[in-house]
Amino acid sequence: MRKPVMAGNWKMYKTPAETIAFFEKFRPLVEKSSHCEIVICPPFTNLAAAVDAVRGTSIRVGAQNVGWAKEGAFTGEVSGPMLNAMGVSHVIIGHSERRQYFNETDETVLKRTQAALEFGLTPIVCVGELLADREGGRTEAVLAGQFQKGIAGLTEQQFAKIVIAYEPVWAIGTGKTATPEIAADTHRAIRGQVREKFGKEAADAVRILYGGSVKPDNAKVLMGQPEIDGVLVGGAALDPVSFASIVNF
């Protein structure tokens, strides 16, 4: 059975002091939540505070991006070894906002994913379609293209260590949410692509998260779909009570 991953993406919010305050409220609310893996991904400036705040718990800390090189003249980038040395365990790669605003491509997603794995991080690799793709019936084709260019280049051993997050771009920060049935159907299609490339065992094992306006009032019904193995939460993960409610669906 696949253990759910409940991940929070803080994007560009909170200071280190606010991070500490969040965990002071959040930790007691999830101390018995052994049914899932909890990962919180704050901005780079808050990683040290977050790692200190979760010490002694099962809560994991993730980054929101990782450089594809070990070191070098890459202004603004943070490498896998740097994150690993801080105690970071996960990293979000290929989020739609990275693709939209910073020209992230499927090819750079693959490079970052390979680097994360090389340096001991668990990648949460994001895929998703635009509203025009959904309305035009191109969802599966778009996701297949992202999979082929951004994920299929991994070896079987590498693929076994990643988590996939399906984030319909039209549902991020809009208040719109894919119905549980639409989300499950899309997850099923992604799992089918995994089966074709990496085999049935890999398809049965990989965890596919849903991300797109996840809130306390829809988390339970989303998690009731057998194809959905967790969630990648944005705005609702900024509030400790709200995110704890999602974790404890």
UniProtKB/Swiss-Prot annotation:
Listed InterPro entries: Aldolase_TIM (IPR013785), TIM_sf (IPR035990), TrioseP_Isoase_bac/euk (IPR022896), Triosephosphate_isomerase (IPR000652), Triosephosphate_isomerase_AS (IPR020861)
Localization, per the record, is: Cytoplasm
Q: Name one GO cellular component term.
A: cytosol
Describe which pathway this protein belongs to, using the record's wording.
Carbohydrate biosynthesis; gluconeogenesis; Carbohydrate degradation; glycolysis; D-glyceraldehyde 3-phosphate from glycerone phosphate: step 1/1
Q: Is Isomerase given among the entry's keywords? A: yes
What the record says about family reads: Belongs to the triosephosphate isomerase family.
What this protein is reported to do is described as:
Involved in the gluconeogenesis. Catalyzes stereospecifically the conversion of dihydroxyacetone phosphate (DHAP) to D-glyceraldehyde-3-phosphate (G3P).
Quaternary structure note: Homodimer.
- This chain's protein is named Triosephosphate isomerase
Species annotation = Solibacter usitatus (strain Ellin6076)
By which gene is this protein encoded?
tpiA
